[in-house]
Amino acid sequence: MWDSYLLNLKKDRIRNVLINSRGYGEMKGDKVKTTILRHFFEEINSETIIKIEPIQVKLFGLTNEYWVSFAYEGHIYDKKYVFVRGSIDKANFTTIPYIDKKGVMIR
């Protein structure tokens, strides 16, 4: 079991953070979709990391998507982070800021 995190790299807090996560693809020749999970955080302080959810290693064979929406400086922002099938692998590790752990990161 691994954990997924959201990093607020901005110099100010972000608000009304909504994260939708899902996995999809093929496993053993069958099309697979995970349940869509939704997470809400009223506020995430600047230069902070928060744990979103655990992710099972068996799901690394799927494409894993995190769709993040938040309010910042009076505007709404929306971005999709996609870990394509097989990208969550030690070969793609980097040091994750603020927690000083190794993992896969998309900016």
Describe each PLM feature range.
Residues 11-28:
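Short acidic, flexible loop segments centered on an aromatic residue
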Residues 53-107:
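Terminal connector regions
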